[in-house]
Regions:
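Bacterial N-terminal signal peptides
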Residues: 6-14
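Short, solvent-exposed loop/turn elements at domain surfaces
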Residues: 25, 35-42, 179-182, 210, ...
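Extended active-site neighborhood of metal-dependent phosphoesterases/phosphodiesterases
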Residues: 40, 49-50, 55, 95-198, ...
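Positively charged n-region of N-terminal signal peptides that target proteins for export
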Residues: 1-4
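Short acidic, glycine-rich surface-loop motifs adjacent to enzyme active sites
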Residues: 195-212
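Active-site glycine-centered loops adjacent to acidic/histidine catalytic or metal-binding residues
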Residues: 32, 88-89, 126-127, 204, ...
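C-terminal/domain-terminus segments
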Residues: 86, 94-106, 333-354
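N-terminal active-site segment of His-dependent metallophosphoesterases
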Residues: 19-99
């Protein structure tokens, strides 16, 4: 077990460019995708909820999910994106055996990669990527999915990774490890890279609460990690919630902005306008409602810590899918959110270099 964890936590580092290269570039960001196919499910779904998810996924991958990826691939090429990042839940999971889960993850990754043949495709683990039949299975995601990511990075395999793009540091975190390991990984990455322009934390689970459905299902060690990151010019990129959102935390030490993305095919070209539907008050009220039962005291302490860490704001948007292009330059990091073939529906500054 110790040997396995040692391998999992290898720090994978790659310098894609020399420091002298142009400091402006663009990155494609994809949210949850949930690739699925009947060939991985020979057994009946173990619950009605999972049966509905399978039906949803099969319908998505008959057309909408493919068209979303086609659009993203064309956009990445026309905008000269230098790499693409997928925010976890690249696959549905729930495969009948560990071997089938590994095959599902490989096919999911290669399906997405086929739309970005000329640039590296990176990913982090999502909760569905480690979902076996009725139980959690880490090994296929560690060996297969993260093995494919390691090849894209050109570095050693690990379920968490880092790389430098010029003056910018990217930290891809495995949010399904113990809290101490998550904190230690981020801390070491920052210590090893003191000279950054921007830091990008790539995580499936949000760092800052971004949903009213499970407001405390966040990255392990999220408070400590946020304290470390707010001292840098940091952008947090997350998935998991199936809704676009922009959440910020401001304290005396700095400001963090988190962008959550979603790329579920069922919400692609849905015809809905992209508009805010919930704010931080909604998230806070949902969190307060969880203070009950046998874990009430523990939850209350978490909520008190959340409140003490700074001032928050949030815009959680209506359910609509798409993708994001990050325009990273010397003055700022700006996100362009696309939910169709036309112009971006939202432009948002995520960090400023001043």
């Amino acid at each position: 077990m110790k040997k396995e964890l040692c391998v999992i936590l290898i720090l994978s580092t790659l310098f894609f460019v020399q420091a002298a290269e142009n400091s402006s570039y663009k990155v494609m960001v994809l949210g949850d995708i949930h690739y699925d196919n009947a060939e991985f499910h020979q057994k009946e779904a173990p619950s009605k909820a999972l049966k509905k998810e399978r039906i949803r996924n099969y319908e998505m991958w008959k057309g909408p999910s493919v068209r979303l990826l086609e659009s993203a691939g064309k956009r990445a090429k026309s905008e000269s994106c230098v790499f693409a990042i997928q925010m976890g839940d690249i696959a549905q999971g729930d495969a009948d055996t560990p071997e089938l889960l590994g095959k599902m993850l490989e096919k999911a990754f290669r399906t997405v990669k086929s739309h970005f043949p000329d640039i590296p495709l990176l990913a982090v683990k999502g909760n569905h990527d480690i979902r076996g039949y009725r139980k959690t299975i880490q090994r296929p995601a560690d060996n297969v999915l993260m093995g494919l990511v390691a090849k894209e990075l050109g570095a050693g395999k690990g379920s968490s990774w880092t790389f430098r793009k010029g003056k910018d540091l990217y930290i891809g975190i495995d949010g399904f490890r113990p809290e101490k390991q998550c904190i230690a990984f981020v801390k070491k990455a920052l210590q090893d890279n003191p000279d950054t322009r921007y830091v990008f934390l790539v995580t499936h689970l949000p760092l800052i609460p971004a949903t009213v459905h499970s407001p405390f299902w966040n990255l392990p060690g999220n408070f400590e990690i946020a304290d470390l990151l707010e001292k840098r010019k940091t952008v947090v990129l997350a998935g998991h919630t199936h809704s676009f959102s922009i959440v910020s935390r401001k304290s005396r030490n700095g400001k963090l902005i988190q962008l959550v993305s979603t790329s579920l095919g069922r919400d692609w070209l849905s015809g809905k306008p992209m508009q805010p539907s919930l704010d931080w008050t909604s998230v806070r009220e949902a969190a307060q409602k969880t203070v009950r039962g046998k874990n009430a005291e523990k939850t209350r302490r978490i909520l008190e810590t959340l409140d003490s860490k700074g001032e928050y704001s949030a815009r959680i948007y209506t359910r609509i899918s798409g993708y994001v292009i990050l325009n990273i330059g010397e003055e700022r990091v700006e996100a362009a959110i696309y939910t169709g073939e036309g112009k971006p529906v939202l432009m948002e500054i995520l960090a400023e270099n001043r």
